[in-house]
Structure formats: structure tokens, C-alpha cells
Amino acid sequence: MTVSENHAAHGHGTGGHDGGGQGAASGGWTTAARMLQDASPITVPEGASAMTIHVAWEPGDPGTPPHRHSGPAFGYVIQGAVRFELEGEPERVVEAGGTFWEPGGDVIHYQDGNALGDARTEFVVTMMCAPGKPMLELVDEAELAERAHLRAPRPTSAPS
């Protein structure tokens, strides 16, 4: 979906800012950009700040321990593959060119590590942060045990 198709799909109409400057009349800007992710509904804490970071995991790195963010986070995998798991959702692998998002708040983010054992993985993520809250808060073992029933079933290995 192009940016202009997304614009229309979300009822933004035809009026408003046309990008101005060179190329606006040709409409080239409407096809130059490709939508990678459309997440809704999102809740951004009032007075939130935003931070974009670049993360690079070496082969097999499990990533950040279970944690949560105070606001939503939106990511794009540059190279490699991220093992991604949010509370209540099955574990999945997001490959280079793919996106992920999480709502933030109370939801636990279990995994964000490198799914590859032989190559580096890199991604960028933009996180919204509620005022007075840390951008990332680790979840302790007691809370993980208390909320274990909210975690999606774990993948099982086939017998050898």
C-alpha cells in the first residue's frame, strides 16, 4: 500500500498538505514512499517523549530480558531476523524488511533477540515514553511467574 492509498483508506480526504515544493504537482511523492506498518489502535501517553534507537545483536544473542515499555514501540528489521514475542501472542520471527510494534503499558515483551545463530541482526525501534517513567523496565521473576497464564503456549521441538 502506498502512503497516498493509506491516507485515503483512513479517511483523511483529499484536502490538506500536498507536500509542496518540487514534485508536488507530479504526484511522485505518493508512490516514492511505501507503507511498512499500520498499527491501530495505539495509545500514546499524554506528554510522551519519543526515542529512536538502533539495536545490533551478535549471532544467537537472546536480546533484552523480559521487559515492558511505558508507551507504544514501532520497529523495523534492517538485517537478520528478530525473535519477537509479546505477552498473549505466539513467538514469531521478523525477518529483514519486516516490522513489529507493541502497545506498551502493562504488556510484557518477552523476546527481541537474534533468531540467527550465524549472522548479526540489526533493527531500529521508535519508542514512546510516558513522562516520569523509564523507557524500558525489566520484569522480575516473581511477576513473570504471576503472569505465566497470559503467555502464549511455547513452541515445542520435534523429538529427535
Where are these regions (language model features)?
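A short, N-terminal "cap"/entry segment at the start of jelly-roll beta-barrel domains
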Residues: 1-51, 93, 137-160
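Short beta-strand/loop turn elements enriched in aromatics
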Residues: 43-44, 61-71
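Short acidic-glycine-tyrosine-enriched beta hairpin
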Residues: 45-49, 56-58, 81, 86-106
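Short, conserved beta-strand element in jelly-roll/cupin
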Residues: 56-58, 69-84, 123
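N-terminal post-signal-peptidase region of extra-cytosolic proteins
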Residues: 58-61, 70, 107-112
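Short histidine-centered beta-strand/loop micro-motifs
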Residues: 64-69, 86, 93, 112-114
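Ligand-binding loop in jelly-roll beta-barrel domains
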Residues: 90-91, 104-134
